[in-house]
Amino acid sequence: FRSTAAGRCLPVTCCVFPRHFRVSSSSILPSNAKVVGGCKKNRQIAVEAAQSLEVDSQQPMNQEEVSEKMRQLREKIRWMLQNMDDGEISVSPYDTAWVAMVEDIGGGGGPQFPTSLEWISNNQLDDGSWGDLRFLIYDRILNTLACVAVLTQWKMHLHKCQKGLRFIRENIDNLENGNDEMMPVGFEVAFPSLIQTAKKVGIKIPTDSPFMKNIYAKRDLKLRKIPMDILHTKPTTLLHSLEGMEGLDWEKLLNLRTDDGSFLMSPSSTAYVFRHTKDELCHQYLLKSVNKFNGGVPNVYPVDMFEHLWCVDRLQRLGISRYFQVEIQECLDYVYKYWTNKGICWARNTNVQDVDDTAMGFRLLRLHGYDVSTDAFKQFEKAGEFCSFPGQSTDALTGMYNLYRASQTMFNGEHILADAKEYSTNFLHKKRLANAIVDKWIITKDLPGEVGYALDVPFYASLPRLEARFFLEQYGGDDDVWIGKTLYRMLYVNCDTHLELAKLDYEKCQAVHQLEWESIQKWYRDWNLVEFGLSERSLLLAYYIAASTVFEPERSRERLAWAITAILVKTIASQRQLPLETKGESLGSILENEDGGRLIEFLINTIHQLSSEIVVAEGRDITQQLSNTWQKWLKTCKEGGDDDLGEAEARLIVHTLHLSSGLDESSFSHPKYHQLLEATSKVCGQLRLFQSRKQVDVDLATGTTFQIEAGMQELVKLVFTNSSEDLDSLTKQSFFSIARSFYYTAYCDEGAINSHIDKVLFEKID
């Protein structure tokens, strides 16, 4: 390998792969091995091939403007992560109207929160409505009716009221055509209550349409599920929608406040209770919210847990989390501080939990080494079925989607996660078959694409660059809108800044990968490797797997070491498939002919070149370690059965990757290292065998085996649990990365892999 001016490492001299070879079990590839046969011609070819692998160091890889732009974007995102508080969220006109309805508790006759009334008067849209710029009929009607009602109550801005009423009259019939899946949270309770409130100030809304009758029926069903005695004594989701409800016992309800003085973090619900109780804790909560948002209030606040978790998730899936490891650790430390064995909600210290936040929190915490219990899912499960909130009538698709994602991080014996995986998988498959991938909590750019990717490429098979490439198309940035009581935006979660950095980063990585691939192709052609049975598709697959896993530009040495090792393995191991009458000649007399000399020369040369890079970078020689690693693999290739090849290949790639990365020698003798190596090689062996059988057995077309799944679960536990004396997390995760690459090629069919290769390595981002 050679280092370019751009700081990358590219192979100078690599090995070529002959069709025939002989293995000596007593002395395989010693560091002072002599090449047998007349190889002067081969050496000349080697020099020419080496030159073909060099990339012009004068090429303008480092574009100063792009680099500066990326630096600015990173700093902007880092500032967001470092300054997270209770959540950056857009204002809800509906909730602001309920806050503005509160009369001065001092008896002055005016509004208690005049700035809220001012916010409403300043934020009417041109068509007379209030609401998010994304038009959703439920959202616009609810927001507009609430704002007209409060302006009418205070006898202000008659012209704005008339304009708003005109919008309602012209559009209310369109509620019939709305998608029930996108109906705002608690709409079936909030809208009838708001109609009654509007009626008290002289605004009449017809309630005899089929839609309205259906809404009232849904309200009655929900109230039957949570009767009044339960409402007053146990925390339920109805605490989020108390506004306008009659016949409530206010003193009993005050016992169900959260620590911040709110009722399930709902400004509108809290404002309604405050109107009747003048409770000081409610007052302080509302005052804090109004001051934070300059008169307006969100539909829910705080949203700190939601913001911390979803921001980390987005950065990871976009492939840029490596820039913010310190900040991500701080985010997850914050979440873990408030984690409970009953799960979590969108805010800290809540008395109601939901499966969506719980699943997202569980998955991210587990994958970062935190100790989290599956008990968190118990209250969402009943007889093998799962719900978003205990007692609710419908499931949110994204809640089941995140439950599905969380279930794939299960350890052996975690039965509730096994049940969750089965239920959520079936739920999502049915929705996809029915073309019904629509969610009640978010309107995103490509939710069907997100769900489809998760189902088609499960966690064990999801290579980092592959996931990032798909999510770059699915993530809408600023355009993604959440559905609460009203539509709202999470400004740090769905953000064009994230998307812009992710695209620039991906393009930078892709450019490096394309240059490396061009060099490898030229090397392949110069050596005419097709003569040795190596197809260009196999060459490309080996590089793609390595580049999709070890993708960072600065890790070129590791990436190419992995790819070249896999290419060598593929070529040499393919000789085992020769007919019996020729195999003896292949394995027995290879060193006596010219091709055998080429093999030995290139294999030894590869070892020395890999080692020389480490000598330059780390100041230590790994030649003997690499040689020993290859000796073990070659011995298995000669003497072992098909069952052994996958295990041996995994061990070879693990050791080559770690030696190339400069991993400290003491790590190789660490007890955890041996555990991880055994678990990884075992499951990789099973995967290679399964992959071979799958090619001839149509019954194995989908899924894997119980033994493979159990092996992956064991490996996940070893990798993602921490102990007092442990390997560093990056080293542990490299074992999972290698197992993942084996799982990917065994799980995905050839057509899917070919399309993935094209998408990841060559397709431009729109």
From Swiss-Prot:
Subcellular location: Plastid, Chloroplast
Xref: InterPro entries: Isoprenoid_synthase_dom_sf (IPR008949), Terpene_synth_N (IPR001906), Terpene_synth_N_sf (IPR036965), Terpene_synthase-like (IPR050148), Terpenoid_cyclase/PrenylTrfase (IPR008930)
GO terms of molecular function: ent-copalyl diphosphate synthase activity; magnesium ion binding; terpene synthase activity
Enzyme class: isomerase
EC number: 5.5.1.13
Cofactor: Mg(2+)
Residues annotated as binding Mg(2+): D354, D356
Keyword ATP-binding attached: no
Gene3D superfamilies in the cross-refs: 1.50.10.160, Farnesyl Diphosphate Synthase, Terpene synthase, N-terminal domain
UniProt key word Isomerase: yes
Transit peptide: 1-30
Function: Involved in the biosynthesis of ent-kaurene diterpenoids natural products such as oridonin, miltiradiene, eriocalyxin B and nezukol, known to exhibit antitumor, anti-inflammatory and antibacterial activities, and in the production of gibberellins phytohormones. Catalyzes the conversion of (2E,6E,10E)-geranylgeranyl diphosphate (GGPP) to ent-copalyl diphosphate (ent-CPP).
The name this protein goes by in its record: Ent-copalyl diphosphate synthase 3
Span(s) of short sequence motif DXDD motif: 354-357
Coarse class of the protein's main subcellular location: plastid
GO terms classed as biological process: gibberellin biosynthetic process; miltiradiene biosynthetic process; terpenoid biosynthetic process
Keywords: Chloroplast, Isomerase, Magnesium, Metal-binding, Plastid, Transit peptide
This protein's pathway: Plant hormone biosynthesis; gibberellin biosynthesis; Secondary metabolite biosynthesis; terpenoid biosynthesis
